[in-house]
Each structure stands twice: as C-alpha cells, then as structure tokens.
Amino acid sequence: KLTYDVAKTSTHGSDELAQIITDAYEQAGEFGVVSHERSYTDETYIKKVEGHPVEAGFTNEMYINNPTYQTCEFDNPMVLLSMNQIKDYNQIAPFIAKAFENNKRTPVVLFSEIDHHVENIILHNVSEFKFPICVVRLPAIGILQREIMNDLSLLFNCEILPSVPTVDFQGMEEKYIGNCKSIKIGANDVSFLKHDNFENDKVTGKINELNSQIKVNDSETEKIYLKKRVARLTGGIA
C-alpha cells in the first residue's frame, strides 16, 4: 500500500502507472532493483529479467544458436572466468578437453578478453564441428570489472583463472570450472539461473556486506551501483 501511494503521488495521480510500479517492485523482490527505460511502443509494461543479469554480451554472432531471439543459450554449461586476455589457445585447451571427457559435449562459456587468433580457432570449431561454446566480453572496466567478476565467481562457484599464462592446469581444472543451470547470452546482455540446490554462504555474506554499505553511503550514484550488485547476486531485477 505504501509503495502504491508513493508511486501514485510520483505519477501525478495515475492509478494505472502506480499499479505498474507497485507490481514491478513486487516482482523484483526485497533486494531487487527496479529501473525504467523509454518504451518503443505505446504500451507501458514490466519486463522482468529472469535469473542473474550481467551487462555483457557475446563477442561474435557466430555463437548464436537461437536465431529467433538472436541469442546463445545453453543448459548446464561449464563456465570459465578470466580477467586477462587469452593469448594462447593452450591456456584454455585443458578445459576444452574436460568438456569432451567421456564422450560428453558440455557447453563452454568463457568470460574473457581474447586474442583474435585464439577466437578464430574457437570459431572454426563452432562452424566445422558445431562445438557448443560462447565467448563473452568482460563487463565494465577497471575496478568495477573486478568487482563484477568477483561476484560472478561466487555465483558460478569457481575461481578466476590466474593471470600467469604458463600455469599448468592439469589436474587442477575443477576449481576453475564454474557451472549454472542455464544461461542466455545476447549481444548486450547475459542472464543465468543457478542450480536449484545451489548453496553458497559467501553469496549471502556478500549480499549482507553490500546492503550495509548502501545504508551508510551518501552518494546516490554509488547506492545505485551497489543495489545493482545486490540485484545480480539475488537475481531480482525488473
């Protein structure tokens, strides 16, 4: 009722807009984020992002496997996170081999900057052998990028690949392999769902930490950014 009353006042007494805003907050949940954008139709509507949103996208349209929606979609993929440019295919070869272990064809999603020679090898495998893989460009830059990637490492339950390109991953691949129930990758947005039985106390701890920072922060810009991080971790955004 309070949300509706505030929304009605903000929209100059519009019952319709007040109800839409109220519904959006209910759908986003306690820790979710509600934002607004210009509609390209005459309709005002709610668009809820299912799962955990990331402001990123595929690096090449050849990764698209759902032409209707122009997205790349995988169930139960192997996820790799790297803060550094992949300059040699051998840096990811052990994980590609892992994806094909025991005659499996596990989809691979790689969040990383990648040398064009390495990506050409990957795209050849996609084109010639229908290898299920997608390279996703890193979100944001600088400190913001590191914070987002650290959040993703909690949600995918894996470590970020080290910066040393000569590291031998043989026998220690598991700790760098993340996973999720499903993922949808577009040109400019990514969303994924965690497994139903996912539990990670570190995620809860990070959410509590961010909410504490929101309460004491005086900067509205910083608060918005922190709330987006909370929304990503909780999976609530409308």
Predicted segments, located by residue:
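Long, structured protein-protein interaction/assembly regions in large complexes
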Residues: 1-238
